[in-house]
Every structure is written in structure tokens, then in C-alpha cells.
């Protein structure tokens, strides 16, 4: 097998093998809406380390405590190196905390700046007017509003920011995470699809969530949460050919994609996908301070001449990946009259 390393175009969704991101908004919305609004299928198995007798450990409750009128600002960046070129973006979002129609605190964010490959992208009037409502308040649901008027270059930053909130929301829903080292495993395993039925005729991945309250710094009162998206013991993805069952990594394969070319041939890939998301939050307020996402996919790919994927060429092995960083930017101080809202 030949081997290559590819850092794929940035998107909140898992990656596609050759031609860029796939399912960008759909997978982020799936995380933000289905996993969080419909938590019934999820099963959490919590584990807490045993502390030595008499020892005390810093404690924190992972919850967001909003202040009405609180100002929010983020810079989010993504780096990608393809086989032939390197691509990157950096974008800035800013907004204010308000209550929505149901009385729930929401971060009402707009997008102010966007650079792609070190060139500033002029945002259209519709993109500047777009509002991304995000909330970590208890009982709040994450979702995306209508994106039809937003220019394409802004879709990745919008969905990538949502993905960080979705992961932190999953962690905040694990109420056993109160001390450094506390751990919860959230089993899901059902496939997420990004197939469009035309070019991508099959595209699925499946993950569980391995969540750890890694540390609480007593000096800075910053809590670090790690959310790993890991292959389930038995991923429920569809593998149409027997060769796809052979493990690409050290777990069962949890990523599959089949593309139909304009010439009637098929590009079929299978692999192991993981995410590692690290989020630093202010322990007292739950506000995000910074975050990183690392998303590698180890892939074995074949070019096939039949729809059954049995008449295929030699396998090609490579690694997809992307890295995203998020940081909170300084904002003006709150007016003294604004009191914390819990």
C-alpha cells in the first residue's frame, strides 16, 4: 500500500477522502440537535477515581451561568494541508447574551471578519446580518437557523463553532463530572450519514463519546474538559464489501464512503475516525476560554469498476485530518448593574 498524510479542509463534520469537506452543517446540527435534544438513546457510564483517605480535590460543576448583556467574542481558526496545497481560515464572531422568547439565555452571535488563506473575504450584507444563537444553559437546545443566505466561505466557521458547543454541552449533561479525573462514557454508535445520493452514494461514520474532566487549576480556576469521539465496539455503519471489514486501525472501522465518478467507476474508502476535543472553561461561569479539536481519519481506499465493490484496484492508505482552535477574545466589562443570572 502507498501511504500519504492529508490534513483535510476544515469542517465540523468528519472528512471526505479526496475532494474536501462533506456534511459540514449536517453533522454539526446532528451533534447539536439530536444528541442533545433527544438524549434518550444515549447511555452514560460514569466512573470516579478513588481519592486517598483525607485527601481533597478541587471541585466544579460544569454549568454555564450567564449574565444578561454579557459580551462574547471568539476567534476560530482551521488549518488544512492537502496533497497539492495548504488551506486555512480564521474568523471572528461577537455578540451579546440575551433571553430568547422562551426566557432562555442565548449567545446571539454575528460574524464580523473572515480570512481564507490569508486573504480577507468581504462578507455580504446577508452574512453580516446572520445571527448564530448558541446556548449552554440548562435545557437549551442547539440548532442552526436558516443558512440559505450565508455565503459559502462562512459555513465552516459557523458549524465548527457549533461543534465545540455541542461537545461542551455533552460534557455538561454528565452531572457526575465534578472533580478532576471524573470520567463518563456516553454510548451512541448509530451512524451519521452525509451521502447526497448522487456523487457520494454512501457516507457514514459512528462514534461514542468518552468525556473526562481532566483538570481544575486552583490558581486560575480554569477547568479543562476532554471529549473524545471514539469508535464504538460495534459501529453500525454499512460496509458493502467484505474487504471493508478488515481493520484499518486498532478498532473496528467506523468510517465509510463510496463516491461514484462521472465515468461510472467507484472510489470506496473505509477507515478509523477519532476526534479529540479539549475545552478550557472558567469554572465559576462555564464560559469557554479556549478550545482545540484534532480529527484524524486513517483510510484505506480502492478504485472499483462495479457497484458491489468487488472488482477493485490495489489499496491506497492515507490519513485525513484537521486541526481547529478557538479562543475567547477580550470584551468590554459588564456594567455594574448587571447581576449574575443562574
Where are the model-predicted features located?
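Signature of exported/secreted
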Residues: 45-342
Amino acid at each position: 500500500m502507498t501511504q500519504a498524510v492529508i490534513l483535510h479542509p476544515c469542517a465540523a463534520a468528519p472528512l471526505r477522502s479526496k475532494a474536501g469537506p462533506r456534511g459540514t452543517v449536517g453533522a454539526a446540527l446532528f451533534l447539536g440537535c439530536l444528541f442533545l435534544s433527544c438524549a434518550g438513546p444515549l447511555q452514560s457510564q460514569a466512573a470516579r477515581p478513588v481519592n486517598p483517605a483525607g485527601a481533597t480535590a478541587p471541585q466544579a460543576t460544569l454549568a454555564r451561568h450567564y449574565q444578561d448583556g454579557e459580551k462574547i467574542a471568539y476567534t476560530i481558526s482551521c488549518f488544512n494541508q492537502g496533497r497539492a496545497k495548504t488551506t486555512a481560515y480564521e474568523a471572528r464572531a461577537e455578540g451579546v447574551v440575551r433571553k430568547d422568547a422562551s426566557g432562555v439565555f442565548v449567545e446571539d452571535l454575528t460574524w464580523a471578519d473572515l480570512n481564507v488563506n490569508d486573504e480577507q473575504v468581504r462578507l455580504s450584507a446577508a452574512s453580516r446580518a446572520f445571527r448564530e444563537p448558541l446556548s449552554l444553559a440548562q435545557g437549551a437546545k442547539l440548532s442552526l437557523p436558516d443558512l440559505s443566505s450565508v455565503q459559502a466561505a462562512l459555513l465552516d466557521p459557523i458549524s465548527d463553532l457549533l461543534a465545540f458547543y455541542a461537545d461542551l454541552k455533552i460534557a455538561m449533561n454528565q452531572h457526575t463530572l465534578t472533580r478532576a479525573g471524573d470520567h463518563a462514557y456516553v454510548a451512541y454508535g448509530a451512524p451519521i450519514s452525509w451521502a447526497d445520493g448522487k456523487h457520494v452514494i454512501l457516507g457514514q461514520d459512528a462514534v461514542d463519546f468518552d468525556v473526562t474532566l481532566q483538570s481544575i487549576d486552583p490558581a486560575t480556576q480554569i477547568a479543562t474538559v476532554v471529549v473524545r469521539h471514539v469508535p464504538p465496539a460495534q459501529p453500525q455503519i454499512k460496509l458493502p464489501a467484505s474487504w471493508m471489514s478488515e481493520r484499518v486501525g486498532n478498532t473496528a472501522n467506523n468510517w465509510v464512503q463510496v463516491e461514484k465518478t462521472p465515468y461510472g467507476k467507484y472510489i470506496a474508502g473505509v477507515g478509523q475516525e477519532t476526534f479529540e476535543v479539549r475545552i478550557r472553561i472558567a469554572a465559576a461561569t462555564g464560559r469557554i476560554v479556549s478550545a482545540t479539536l484534532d480529527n484524524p481519519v486513517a483510510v484505506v481506499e480502492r478504485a472499483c469498476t462495479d457497484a458491489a465493490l468487488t472488482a477493485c484496484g490495489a489499496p491506497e492508505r492515507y490519513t485525513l485530518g484537521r486541526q481547529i482552535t478557538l479562543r475567547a477574545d477580550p470584551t468590554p466589562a459588564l456594567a455594574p448593574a448587571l447581576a449574575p443570572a443562574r
